[in-house]
């Protein structure tokens, strides 16, 4: 102290036994800052849970429970105490609440020095279900893919192109088992929180407490605990949405991106990154394979696979030789000619009723939230718009509000024009809430669940609604694009698309690609059990090449035609 000229302070406590951001993530932040033209601090901040970010006002309490620790074998005063001690010996660190003996008995044993009741930290588990499941036998095609990827001992990107129901998840699970047996870890990503419960259930059933979950719907405490479990090397697998790509795993042996084509993998706020790009950087760092899986790969990924940049693996058939669903296009122009102005065509209404009568389930896709798309004044032709985003406000009947789907600005619904004061206004368009109401009014035996952002806002909302549908508490699932990917319900034999033209006509050069992906994915939800699946797609343009490719399940033809269009227009 005299030499340095200042006083040393005593270290009271070490805050973190291990740094929250390891050397790899710090190197990754440098790379991201350069690639995205962002500051390094913003890149580092997006890697941390919100509870650990500077200026965060949220506090997280550490959870404890009392457990019984066995110390030594000594003769006790009563047979009851001896019986309790023997039980405690067989159940190390038994929680007091789970002990079949009274607290009086335990306190007497503790006074004699045979046991000690201590406080132990416990982690909050976001998913409590504990269903154990063994590996399923792989088909020859699945086994070929697994063997091919396991032979890779260096960085390589694999594009796993498998039709819906071809068993890609089983490939992920068995690859993960082999990687864990080598003493390495696995990073598994899905594009949306909606898909997390099903993927978590699959991984938890095989690997139990070795799995951690990371996504934004976890509570502050759960997310904090899961992050600490990863930092402390207590887990071997991390399953999560886009942000899970920054999980502080060590010794990564495999990185998987399911539904790699999904737009949700792109971070729209600063720093703007592509999850696949970050995953490939981490794959290079750890010298491990990166698997990009999809039934409808992005054109960029498929093009790279054909050029040899990625390694292409294919699963062209469903497991157990199950046929793909038959798809029928319903021309809504013909429906109008026959004076049917309903939301559903006559054919689709008949098919829904037949499916319900057979005690089978239905899934209906309408990629539009709310009840009505907008409100128009019939006197002055004014449309009510968001003052911040300049887009029309959507009517939500359940909350009786007009809401902006970009910034969530909302005002109470008043049937009056804000511009001229006229009450001669009309709600135009249809959303999931309107379809839900229509089904309940027109099908007497319909038990409907609506599955969109609005119905799943609360914690565990996704899990609860999907569990109810899986348990057949409802027989119709109506939803937005959230129902299109990754869901596996064996009793669903009919899928209906209310309006295929919604995404086909948006002003985006990727409109064709996204429409094909959405329709092919949602079609794949049908017929995943023992019964043949059927799909009906309502459209005003049934001869469009995208819809014809969907009808024939022909990805190669779609790829060929769409690439020709992009090359002519000089699109990416």
Model segments located where?
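Accessory, non-ATPase domains that flank or precede helicase/AAA+ motor cores in DNA-metabolism machines
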Residues: 1-294, 306-322, 559
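Flexible beta-alpha connector loops of hexameric P-loop NTPases
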Residues: 212-220, 262-272, 335-341, 424-428, ...
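A conserved SF2-helicase RecA2
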Residues: 302-307, 523, 531-569
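Arginine/glycine-rich "motif VI" loop of SF2 helicases in the C-terminal RecA-like domain
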Residues: 37, 281-286, 524-532, 570
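Conserved helicase motor
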Residues: 190-195, 212-224, 240-246, 368-369, ...
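Conserved RecA-like helicase motor core of SF1/SF2 enzymes
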Residues: 258-272, 276-277, 470-475, 480-529, ...
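Cys/His-rich short segments
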Residues: 348, 357-443
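Conserved interdomain linker/interface between the two RecA-like ATPase lobes of SF2 helicase motors
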Residues: 281-282, 288-292, 298-378
């Amino acid at each position: 102290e005299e030499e340095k000229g200042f006083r040393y302070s005593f270290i009271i406590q070490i805050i973190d036994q291990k740094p929250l951001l390891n050397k790899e993530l710090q190197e990754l932040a440098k790379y991201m800052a350069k690639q995205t033209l962002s500051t390094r601090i913003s890149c580092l901040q997006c890697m941390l849970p919100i509870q650990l970010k500077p200026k965060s006002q949220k506090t997280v309490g550490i959870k404890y429970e009392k457990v019984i620790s066995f110390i030594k074998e000594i003769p006790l005063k009563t047979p009851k105490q001896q019986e309790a001690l023997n039980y405690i010996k067989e159940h190390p660190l038994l929680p007091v609440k789970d002990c079949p003996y009274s607290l009086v008995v335990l306190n007497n044993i503790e006074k004699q020095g045979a046991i000690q009741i201590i406080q132990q930290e416990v982690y909050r588990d976001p998913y409590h279900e504990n269903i154990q499941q063994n590996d399923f036998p792989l088909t020859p095609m699945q086994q070929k893919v697994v063997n091919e990827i396991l032979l890779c001992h260096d960085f390589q990107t694999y594009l796993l192109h498998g039709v819906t129901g071809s068993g890609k998840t089983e490939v992920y699970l068995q690859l993960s088992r082999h990687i864990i047996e080598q003493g390495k870890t696995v990073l598994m990503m899905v594009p949306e929180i909606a898909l997390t419960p099903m993927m978590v259930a699959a991984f938890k059933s095989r690997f139990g407490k070795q799995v951690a979950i990371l996504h934004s719907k976890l509570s502050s405490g759960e997310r904090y605990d899961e992050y600490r479990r990863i930092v402390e090397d207590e887990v071997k697998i991390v399953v999560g949405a886009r942000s899970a790509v920054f999980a502080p795993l060590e010794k990564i042996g495999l990185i998987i991106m399911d539904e790699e084509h999904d737009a949700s993998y792109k971070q729209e706020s600063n720093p703007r990154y592509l999850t696949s790009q970050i995953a490939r950087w981490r794959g290079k760092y750890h010298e491990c394979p990166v698997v990009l899986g999809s039934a409808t790969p992005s054109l960029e990924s498929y093009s790279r696979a054909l050029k040899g940049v990625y390694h292409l693996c294919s699963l062209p058939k469903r497991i157990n030789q199950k046929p793909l669903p038959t798809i029928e296009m319903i021309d809504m122009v013909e429906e109008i000619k026959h004076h049917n102005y309903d939301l559903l065509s006559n054919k689709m209404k008949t098919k829904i009723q037949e499916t319900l009568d057979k005690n089978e389930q239905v899934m209906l896709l309408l990629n539009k939230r709310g009840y009505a798309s907008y409100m128009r004044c019939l006197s002055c032709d004014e449309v009510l718009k968001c003052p911040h985003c300049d887009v029309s406000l959507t009517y939500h009947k359940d909350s009786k509000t007009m809401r902006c789907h970009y910034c969530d600005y909302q005002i109470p619904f008043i049937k009056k024009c804000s511009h001229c004061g006229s009450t001669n206004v009309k709600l135009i368009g249809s959303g999931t809430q309107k379809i839900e109401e229509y089904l309940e009014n027109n099908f007497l035996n319909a038990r409907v669940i609506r599955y969109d952002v609005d119905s799943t806002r609360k914690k565990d909302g996704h899990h609860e609604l999907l569990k109810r549908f899986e348990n057949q508490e409802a027989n119709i699932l109506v939803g937005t694009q959230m129902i299109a990917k990754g869901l596996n319900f064996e009793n669903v034999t009919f899928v209906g698309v209310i309006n295929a033209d919604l995404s086909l006509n948006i002003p985006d050069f990727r409109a064709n690609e996204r429409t094909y992906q959405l329709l092919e994915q949602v079609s794949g939800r049908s017929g995943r059990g023992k019964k043949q699946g059927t799909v009906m797609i309502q459209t005003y343009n049934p001869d469009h090449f995208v819809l014809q490719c969907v009808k024939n399940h022909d990805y190669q033809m779609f790829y060929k035609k769409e690439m020709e269009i992009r090359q002519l227009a000089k699109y990416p």
